[in-house]
Amino acid sequence: MIPFYKLERYEGNEALFELVMMSIVASLVGEPLHIHAEGLRGTGKTTIMRAAKGILPNITRIKGCVYNCDPAAPHCPHHRNMSPNEISNLGTEEIPMPFLEISHSAKVGTVAGSVDLARLTDISHPEAQLLPGLIPQAHRGIIFIDEINRLADTSPEITDILLDVMGNKPGHIQIEEAGLPVVDVTVSVSVWAASNPDEDPGPVEEIRRQLSDRFDMVCYMGRPNSVDILSQMLKENSHQWKAQAKEREAAVEEGKNEVFRSNIVKWAGQYEKADLPDFLRNYIARLYIKHNLESIRAIEAMQSGAILHSIIKGRDKVAINDVTHMIPLVLKHRVDSDTMVRMINDVDSKGVKDGILSFKNRKKNDKEADPDYFPHNATPLKDIRRSDLVNTEKSLTPNEG
């Protein structure tokens, strides 16, 4: 596989590269960011996502823990009730951030967990224990699903598991086996998915709308339209190039990957301290109300996405463009096309900068609260005579009677 740093970047896949980096940064600080890439088959969606496995940073876990327990916050059935001293005695180890895939042939037990047959059939010491599935083993990492629209259509049980995992941050998963107690495990995992909405069974939002809403952001993967880029892609995928690359690029590849890892760790530190200014938060809230959006997940994703986007772009503060850049990514799969067009036209017609800055410069007190607000060309109330202030029926109808 072509290493991540050598993958060709062009306008059509720029958004996916950004979302991949943003999701890794968020995952490293324990905040999953679920992303979905849509596009024509063969445009490189899965290639980019799988290649990102090579740049994932390390995480620290309790030594030998298959649930990837954080030593500072153990969550698995074996370690969550242990004291800090007991955890310290077990020791810790560093491993690459998990990256696991759910295939379309996977069973519920493979994904969630099942009886550990190796221990159950151990002749010397047989015992019944649960073996965590792919999702619990991917805790603090990434789960990737290719052609998720097909999975949503053909595997409703696995889709239900994903809904639980992605419903909250962190999510949870329940492992059930006959004869054993039910185990509920916290899981902090970012779900990455790819699909072609133009092929059967269609877009995810038309198959399981709940699952579609669970994805924080969705981007559409465009085709390359440059002769130079396509020529370079062909070259890097030729047999001769791959054979030569094995010999000359092993050390170079690791060095390049380390640069990505260092940046990710740096960005994660910045993200933990970063926040969105109130005037931008007010703008996002106004979008939710004005355009009658359904899911609060949408504006939560818009907030975290704007912060992450500003960080990977090297900015110290969140810019207005970071927020507007998130609008189509966050709302494409949540609103109909007419609503999306109205929102984009609304932002364009009013002027993004002027519209958002009106919140930044808005005074907290209304003008009416200002004692100088009302004009002073009227007679003060204290100077009006009672006869002028209180009208009787006779004064109002002087010509009657």
Predicted segments with their positions:
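Conserved interaction-surface patches within small, structured recognition/assembly domains
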Residues: 2-8, 145-146, 286-293
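Pre-Walker A (pre-P-loop) alpha-helix and adjacent loop at the N terminus of AAA/AAA+ ATPase modules
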Residues: 2-41, 116, 306
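Basic, amphipathic alpha-helical bundle interface domains used for macromolecular binding and assembly
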Residues: 14-15, 155-159, 192, 225-337
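Short, contiguous clusters of charged residues that form electrostatic/catalytic patches at enzyme active sites
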Residues: 18, 22, 129, 282
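Conserved, well-folded catalytic cores of nucleic-acid-processing
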Residues: 19, 23-30, 55-59, 114-121, ...
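Short amphipathic alpha-helical segments at helix boundaries and their inter-helical linkers
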Residues: 31, 126, 297, 334-342
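Canonical AAA+ ATPase core
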Residues: 35-40, 47, 51-90, 94-99, ...
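C-terminal engagement/docking regions of AAA+ P-loop ATPases
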Residues: 36, 41-47, 286-289, 311-401
